[in-house]
Regions:
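Outer-membrane beta-barrel "beta-signal"
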Residues: 250, 505-507, 512, 531-547
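C-terminal outer-membrane beta-barrel translocator/porin domains of Gram-negative envelope proteins
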Residues: 346-485, 489-491, 525, 537-542, ...
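Outer-membrane beta-barrel translocator/channel fold
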Residues: 294-318, 324-325, 329, 343-349, ...
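Outer-membrane beta-barrel channels and translocator barrels
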Residues: 199, 224-226, 255-257, 284-286, ...
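Transmembrane beta-strand segments that form the barrel wall of outer-membrane beta-barrel proteins
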Residues: 227-237, 248-252, 258-270, 275-277, ...
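Residues that define the transmembrane beta-barrel architecture of outer-membrane proteins
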Residues: 213, 242-246, 271-275, 314-318, ...
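Transmembrane beta-strands of outer-membrane beta-barrel proteins
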Residues: 229-231, 260-264, 288-292, 320, ...
């Protein structure tokens, strides 16, 4: 039986190789590449479900009192020296520089108040709302003046609004010891770092304590839903295994009370069953997160030229990933990423294995996000080292690829917004294994073509959408026009280009229900029997929003 499988595998090899050279492949029979397309759809859905980050100031404190203005006049004296209380936020050299503008001059009470105002201006510029400079009662004997610096000390810290998130988890990242001077800039940095690296969001509120010079810190917590469930039906499946499919997405937040996330994504069509389970958990106080995932799929070819050959396949992948933020502020997030994946893929013709492969993939990369109130841009390049094994013929290949993804969104006037998404792969080797090819065509890449219309060793695609929020006319309606483009590169032909344009909409008449549709028009013919347009639609239901 093993010899028969080998003979049949060699017999089919010329067909698949010829198709690969032509870059007009027959309907996909590789479960690995079908799994990658499903993974794209999962990633796109998870991107849409990302919890919005908190806008506005991370720390809110009482308004600083207006500077006291005292009319000039009255007794004047020669200011010989100014002394200050110790400060945690202003260096002695900076204080001396302020005082130098006044020392050695004739001055009155109004001039002294100007000196105090200069110090308070420094506090204000540095966001230190819990500190104040004052001029205490004194005689100014010998031209010596003392300026009192009161820098608020933390009296107590409270946490409110956390239902599924542990108080200890929050204070581990935003923790300031009581009875010490409250470092407001550090508090702001800690809150921003936490918010940019967690779904849970914090707003720090500063309030006067029971005595002058004491400050209470209240951490107001905003949490995502504990459970998120989406059930959907669409025609975005792979044509060879059935375009009509149903699926669900489930997310459980805060299982351990530490912003951990358990997710499941599954789809089912006539010839395809695929599921992905993942768990992601923070492992340090600086936003580092460790994730594990398992994906398994089974296919049966129900359409296309291989339908009569009883083609089936299966694939699975286990992966571990780690992300560690390196630099975080209100406008930037730079994160190092690492991952390891082990995958297995097998294709059978009439229950005889014709391909059976496994791979080990090591990935290292970086993601950079720049964001503001009206825009967000993310670029995430990565380097991959892959060891691929052919378990039937016994071959081993080692090769490297450079991959990446990018997305951007910009709010425009008149209820308009612009979004861009893209991905790429570059491989130095040629004729990569089928489950490592870069494919384009379909609802997540170039919408004017069927899924996996073309594939190659290297490639790219991008989507550009101009949206118009029509909610003022019809509640929950968003319309857009789009332009998609992509290319794949291999040996023959060296390049296959796909371009399309079209229109789409998303309509949520009520919060639990969303209808999505798009029509893409291809700009050129690249596959046989190519349709004049591609329609993709989806209906999504969120039952938990009814509760």
């Amino acid at each position: 039986m093993r010899k028969l499988g080998l003979v049949l595998g060699l017999g089919v090899a010329p067909l698949t190789c010829s198709a690969a050279y032509a870059q007009v492949p027959p309907p996909q029979v590789n479960p690995g590449i079908i799994e990658r397309d499903i993974d794209r759809q999962r990633q796109r859905l998870e991107q849409q479900q990302q919890v919005p980050k908190q806008q506005g100031p991370a720390v809110i404190g009482p308004q600083r009192a207006l500077a006291v203005t005292i009319p000039g006049g009255g007794d004047r004296f020669l200011l010989r020296k100014v002394t200050f209380d110790p400060s945690k936020f202003i260096t002695p050299e900076e204080l001396d520089a302020v005082a130098a503008k006044y020392v050695g001059k004739q001055i009155d009470i109004a001039g002294l108040q100007d000196l105090v105002t200069d110090i308070n201006r420094i506090y204000a510029e540095r966001g230190i709302v819990t500190a104040i400079a004052t001029l205490p009662p004194q005689t100014a004997a010998g031209g010596l003046v003392k300026i009192k610096l009161t820098e608020g000390r933390l009296q107590r810290t409270g946490v409110e609004g956390n239902q599924q998130t542990s108080k200890d988890y929050i204070l581990r990242s935003v923790d300031h010891p009581p009875n010490e001077v409250l470092d407001v800039p550090k508090l702001n940095r800690d809150v921003v770092w936490f918010n940019r690296t967690n779904d849970v969001q914090i707003r720090a509120l500063l309030q006067p304590g029971t005595d002058f010079g004491l400050t209470d810190l209240q951490l107001a917590i905003t949490e995502p839903p504990v459970n998120t469930l989406q059930v959907f039906a669409d025609n975005q499946g792979v044509e060879t295994t059935g375009k009509l499919q149903g699926g669900l997405y489930y997310k459980r937040h805060g299982l351990l009370g530490i912003d951990d996330r358990l997710t499941f994504y599954g789809v089912k069509s006539e010839g395809n069953l695929n599921g992905n389970a993942a768990y992601n958990v923070p492992i340090n106080a600086w936003g580092g997160r460790l994730g594990v995932s398992y994906t398994q799929g089974r296919i049966n070819i129900i359409q296309g030229q291989f339908r009569t050959l009883d083609v089936s396949g299966r694939s699975n992948q286990v992966a571990v990933n780690f992300g560690q933020p390196l630099f975080v502020n209100s406008g930037w997030l730079v994160q190092a990423n690492a991952a390891y994946a082990h995958g297995v893929s097998q294709t059978d013709f009439a229950s005889i294995s014709v391909t059976s492969t496994r791979y080990d993939k090591k990935t290292g990369g970086l993601s950079v996000t720049a964001s503001g109130a009206e825009y967000a841009v993310t670029v995430a390049p990565a380097f991959n080292a892959i060891e691929w094994h052919d378990k039937i013929l016994g071959g081993v290949r080692n090769f490297e690829t450079v991959t990446g993804a990018a997305n951007a969104s910009v709010k425009l006037p008149s209820e308009l917004s612009l979004s861009l998404m893209g991905s790429w792969q570059y491989a130095w080797d040629k004729l990569l294994p089928g489950d490592q090819l870069f494919s384009i065509g379909g609802p997540t890449t170039v919408r004017g073509y069927p899924t996996n219309a073309a594939a190659g060793d290297s490639g790219y695609y991008f989507n550009m959408e101009l949206h118009r929020d029509m909610s003022a006319l019809i509640k929950g309606l968003d319309t857009y026009i789009f332009l998609d483009s992509g290319s794949v590169y291999s040996t023959f032909p060296p390049k296959t280009q796909l371009d399309s344009a079209g229109i789409g909409l998303s309509w949520s008449p009520v919060l639990p229900l969303t209808f999505e549709a798009s029509v893409g028009i291809p700009w050129r013919v690249v596959i046989s029997d190519q349709a004049n347009y591609q329609f993709y639609g989806r209906v999504t239901f969120r039952p938990l929003l009814l509760l």
